[in-house]
């Protein structure tokens, strides 16, 4: 993986942070906040444009996050705008920024002490400031009114990874960073061209420098630029707007992602954590959402367990699943922490400890550790450190996820739906089994058919887990179904000492003090797709622990003989990644891509997909760690907002990816 290095800072005589890497200050020694307001807000005409803006979300791009001063300043200005203009069309601010050398959290907090007027906003940022993990970190603030996408890594690598459609995504660019003379590697034509590709047709740009090659480079990229008066004693700076934008998309035609068109109502089918997180993300965006759940209450399916572990799925190369689950886990923690401010549900960020219980698991975990991840994300523990961390004697080393923990998914899911139920733009229809989805070409609406009746919606999301085959549109998606049984174990004096989630060839949670039980599990049964109690699975759950931890008496105290348990059916994918996005028209795709290997790239048609039909499926056994970000991704796509993952990672989540992979190789799709 590409490791991220924190900024190395010094502090000058007036308390301004100075980069050791670039020998330059992060902001003006005199008044950095006023300079930000002058250079980036005033010269980009931000206040005037917000008054006239005709879309819900205004997107700002920034080339160097640094201390986050520009972000905090524009956030403050946006709050002032919202208070003064409650009826404005513009409701949301989205800030996309890049940083090669992020400040440590401690340095960030110290830098922000220079601006007491920003302290309240800065504290909200500190709460969710990410560890040094590559690529995009989405931070949702003020109940969705403000979103920060912080891309960690070299901008020359990150900028080509940002997904965008034909219209672009950026309304205004803040071209900021260390002075061109101090950081010549960043200031080049590739940067200016990349900014132009992401820009919308009315995009504006401003920068503190007046260097001639910067102005000429931006003009070459398609911006009309001019010199204007600089801030304070600076004579000049440059500002301008997009003049000639090329219509293009970064999505490959066979992995195309489209937003919902003519959006006025959305139906979500499903009642689990994925549906709850998606409904919340859409409602925050002002959408009218109706939920259909076949059960009498939410979380009756795979999201109904008492305790589930929350931790990332990583690998040493930081590819595939790792590039999805690292940011997804961090977003899930943010999501849960924000939910806990208003809702009551059992959870504990006690950490997760994964035992090196045999040679195979040791090799696998050592390989994962070779990825050089930030210590806030994962640490290796010795035998003694492991025993101290879990609170029980153990004779094996481990890896520890200090930010991990457990939560009660049933309580969280139900609490989210209860909260949503108080809002005017959310309706839940429980005990409503959707039987059929029919697209009405004349009205351009989906008919959602339940027992003997139907309602119409402009868009539909299928998020019903293992029951995805209910509908003809998703029946051919190559997903699997696996039964799992979790055993509920009464606490003993010794087992109550466990103070971290423990993973081996299974998992065990600490005792929940509210019910004096812990959970162990979970079985993996592909043959019996029911929710009946399985006495063999109950016994095997206990045996897996004693087989992996054979030398400790406490492992034998786990008593499953009371047959207390819960069964559910997971919806799983072969590559361990969810299916998120537009639902493909399988029959049409087979026809249009029948000769895909021999088709010239420029002649490849955009993949056939059902209009305004989306899915959020295949979350498997890691749904608690992935559901919030996958829901945020899909809500962003539906609403045509910037997407929170690199474009090649989005391809690995595309619902049609397995069909496309086979067709690109010239293989017939008979069975996946």
Curated annotation (Swiss-Prot):
Subcellular locations according to the entry: Cytoplasm
Top-rank lineage group of the source organism: Bacteria
Reaction it catalyzes: 5-aminomethyl-2-thiouridine(34) in tRNA + S-adenosyl-L-methionine = 5-methylaminomethyl-2-thiouridine(34) in tRNA + S-adenosyl-L-homocysteine + H(+)
Any single GO BP term: methylation
Keyword RNA-binding found: no
InterPro entries: FAD-dep_OxRdtase, FAD/NAD-bd_sf, MnmC-like_methylTransf, SAM-dependent_MTases_sf, tRNA_MAMT_biosynth_bifunc_MnmC, tRNA_MNMC2, tRNA_S-uridine_synth_MnmC_C
GO cellular component, one term: cytoplasm
Positions of the UniProt region annotated as tRNA (mnm(5)s(2)U34)-methyltransferase: 1-243
Keywords, comma-separated and alphabetical: Cytoplasm, FAD, Flavoprotein, Methyltransferase, Multifunctional enzyme, Oxidoreductase, S-adenosyl-L-methionine, Transferase, tRNA processing
Alphabetized SUPFAM superfamilies for the sequence: FAD/NAD(P)-binding domain
Region (FAD-dependent cmnm(5)s(2)U34 oxidoreductase) residue spans: 269-672
GO molecular function: flavin adenine dinucleotide binding; oxidoreductase activity, acting on the CH-NH group of donors; tRNA (5-methylaminomethyl-2-thiouridylate)(34)-methyltransferase activity
Required cofactor(s): FAD
EC number: 2.1.1.61, 1.5.-.-
Family: In the N-terminal section; belongs to the methyltransferase superfamily. tRNA (mnm(5)s(2)U34)-methyltransferase family. In the C-terminal section; belongs to the DAO family.
HAMAP family: MnmC
Functional summary from the UniProt entry: Catalyzes the last two steps in the biosynthesis of 5-methylaminomethyl-2-thiouridine (mnm(5)s(2)U) at the wobble position (U34) in tRNA. Catalyzes the FAD-dependent demodification of cmnm(5)s(2)U34 to nm(5)s(2)U34, followed by the transfer of a methyl group from S-adenosyl-L-methionine to nm(5)s(2)U34, to form mnm(5)s(2)U34.
Name the record gives this protein: tRNA 5-methylaminomethyl-2-thiouridine biosynthesis bifunctional protein MnmC
Protein species of origin: Vibrio vulnificus (strain CMCP6)
